[in-house]
């Protein structure tokens, strides 16, 4: 998922044309870089304020590339485990809430209830030391899971959306922040043009 933000220089064209070509390019590139970094922070904050997931690494998942004409923010990431969102095991049904403005919803499909447990193979051990344990220690993979049928085996972990999908949401994240990004770009462009003009005085 990536978003491209272009430049509307109509409001600064008169002054912009008075700059030399090299200074025009520098001002545009500087404005785009600054705006892209501001956008990455705003997108991350908006996503964190929208979803119940903890430590999703929204900001780290976004990479910026910019030229003198446009900036691109790319987000990468796999679907997140549902256990990383708000989950309640109270009562006889596991419930989960993905949106902060949402509510806890029971996880039941075809009368089969989800559960929270270690779903790693009981014989699986770590091959080398890691922050989660020493080599040879048993692997634990805690997840919200659900059986695929009535039989005991055939278990699948439950996932929510990926980081790029959440960040790119027109309704909840990108669509909310986009007007601010456009305004920031115009403000930043004016600022760098003013700086260039001051150097030429």
Segments predicted by a language model, with ranges:
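Short, Lys/Arg-rich flexible segments
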Residues: 3-201
């Amino acid at each position: 998922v990536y978003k491209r933000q272009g430049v509307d220089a109509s409001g600064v064209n008169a002054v912009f044309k008075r700059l030399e070509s090299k200074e025009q390019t520098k001002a545009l590139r500087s404005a785009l870089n600054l705006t892209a970094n501001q956008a990455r922070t705003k997108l991350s904050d908006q996503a964190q304020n929208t979803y119940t997931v903890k430590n999703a690494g929204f900001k780290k998942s976004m990479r910026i590339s910019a030229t003198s004409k446009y900036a691109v923010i790319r987000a990468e990431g796999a679907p997140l485990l549902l256990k990383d969102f708000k989950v309640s095991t109270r009562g006889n049904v596991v419930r989960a809430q993905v949106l902060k403005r949402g509510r806890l919803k029971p996880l039941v499909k075809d009368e089969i209830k989800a559960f929270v447990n270690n779903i790693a193979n009981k014989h699986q051990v770590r091959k080398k030391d890691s922050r989660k344990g020493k080599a040879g220690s048993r692997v634990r993979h805690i997840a919200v899971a659900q059986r695929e049928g009535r039989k005991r085996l055939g278990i699948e972990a439950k996932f929510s959306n990926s980081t790029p999908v959440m960040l790119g949401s027109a309704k909840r994240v990108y669509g909310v922040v986009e007007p601010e990004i456009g305004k920031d770009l115009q403000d930043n462009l004016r600022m760098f043009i003013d700086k260039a003009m001051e150097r030429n005085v």
